[in-house]
Curated annotation (Swiss-Prot):
Participates in a pentose oxidation pathway that converts D-arabinonate to 2-oxoglutarate. This is 2-dehydro-3-deoxy-D-arabinonate dehydratase. Disulfide bonds: none annotated. The gene is kdaD. Homotetramer. One of its GO terms (biological process) is D-arabinose catabolic process. Its EC number is 4.2.1.141. Induction: Expression is strongly increased by growth on D-arabinose, both at the mRNA and at the protein level. Mg(2+) binds at residues 148, 150, 169.
Length: 298
C-alpha cells in the first residue's frame, strides 16, 4: 500500500510489542515488520506493509497511557541515541551562568557555541529509554536534575532522516556543573531519556526550523514551570549535527540524534519525585512522563 504522511507508534499488549502506523492522519495499519524497517521502507518508496485495523483508540491511549491490557510505549528501540548540545543561543547563556570550567576566559559552553565543531555526545541505549506515560528518572545522587525538551531525528546508517520525534534529554545538571568530565554520568543512566509518543515521517514536517517547542513541569497538579521556543532559533542546523555525528563514526539504522535545547529551567526548578513533564512540539504531539527519584544504594 502506498500513502503520504505517516505517524508510527507502538503498544505493549500482554507482554508483546505491536507497531502501528497512522496513514494520512486517518487510516491505522498494524505493521508486518520491525518499525525501523517500516520507516526505511516508507522513506524509500512510501510503501507500508501491514493490514488495516479498527478498534485502536490512539487518542485515548495518549490521554490515559493504558486501556485495559494495551499500554503505549516508545515507538522504536533505537540501537543508539546521541545528543547535540549548545545549539541555541539561549542554552549558551543559561549554561554559562553556572560556575563551570573556562578556557582562555570563556566558559566551555561559550567556546563550543562559537567553535566550528559542535558538541556531540553519546546519550542512551534502548534499556535506558522510556516512552509516553513511562517514568523518567532523577539520579539517586543528584539534587538538581532538569528536563531538556528537544526535537530529535531518526536516522538510517547513512545519516538520512527517516522521521522526527520529541525527546527529553534528562540531565543531572549539578554533576555536569561540578566537573565537565562528569558529563557521561550526568547524561547516561536508567531513565535518562524519553521520546515519543510517535515518530512522524519527514513529509509531515515541511520545515523543521519553524516548530514550536513547549515545556511544562507540573507539580501537585499545578504548572510549576513553563517555557517555549521556536526551532528557528537553532544555530547549529540539524544537517551540520548529523554530518559531525557520522564523521568516522558508523551508526546503525534507527539511530536517534537529539538536536539540543533552548529551554533551561533554573536551579530552583529541578525535578522532584512525582512531577509530571509535558513536552509539546507542533506537528508531532505531546510527550508526557512522570518523574521518579531513584533510591540510593546503601
Amino acid at each position: 500500500m502506498h500513502f503520504i504522511m505517516m505517524k508510527l507508534f507502538r503498544v505493549v499488549k500482554r507482554g508483546y510489542y505491536i507497531s502501528y502506523a497512522i496513514l494520512d492522519n486517518s487510516t491505522i495499519i498494524r505493521l508486518d515488520e520491525d518499525p525501523i524497517k517500516a520507516l526505511m521502507r516508507y522513506s524509500e518508496n512510501k510503501e507500508v506493509l501491514g493490514d488495516r485495523v479498527t478498534g485502536i483508540d490512539y487518542q485515548s491511549l495518549l490521554k490515559s497511557f493504558q486501556i485495559n491490557d494495551i499500554r503505549i510505549t516508545k515507538p522504536i528501540d533505537p540501537p543508539e541515541v546521541w545528543g547535540s548540545g549548545i545549539s541555541y543561543e539561549m542554552a549558551r547563556e543559561r549554561y554559562s551562568e553556572e560556575n563551570v570550567a573556562k578556557i582562555l576566559g570563556k566558559t566551555i559552553y561559550e567556546k563550543v557555541y562559537d567553535a566550528v565543531r559542535p558538541e556531540i555526545f553519546f546519550k542512551a541505549t534502548p534499556n535506558r529509554c522510556v516512552g509516553h506515560g513511562e517514568a523518567i528518572a532523577v539520579r539517586s545522587d543528584s539534587e538538581w536534575t532538569l528536563p531538556e525538551p528537544e526535537l530529535a531525528v531518526v536516522l538510517d546508517s547513512n545519516g538520512k532522516i527517516l522521521g522526527y520525534t520529541i525527546m527529553d534529554d534528562v540531565s543531572a545538571r549539578d554533576l555536569e556543573a561540578e566537573n565537565p568530565l562528569y558529563l557521561p554520568q550526568s547524561k547516561i543512566y536508567a531513565g535518562c531519556c524519553a521520546f515519543g509518543p510517535v515518530i512522524v515521517t519527514s513529509d509531515e514536517i515541511k520545515n523543521p526550523y519553524s516548530l514550536d517547542i513547549t515545556l511544562k513541569i507540573v507539580r501537585e497538579g499545578r504548572v510549576f514551570f513553563e517555557g517555549s521556543v521556536n526551532t528557528n532559533k537553532m544555530r547549529r542546523k540539524i544537517e551540520e549535527q548529523i554530518q559531525y555525528l557520522i564523521r568516522d563514526n558508523p551508526i546503525p539504522d534507527g539511530t536517534i540524534l537529539t538536536t539540543g535545547t533552548a529551554i533551561v529551567p533554573g536551579r530552583d526548578k529541578g525535578l522532584k519525585d512525582e512531577d509530571i513533564v509535558e513536552i509539546t512540539i507542533s506537528n508531532i504531539g505531546t510527550l508526557i512522563t512522570p518523574v521518579k527519584k531513584r533510591r540510593k544504594i546503601t
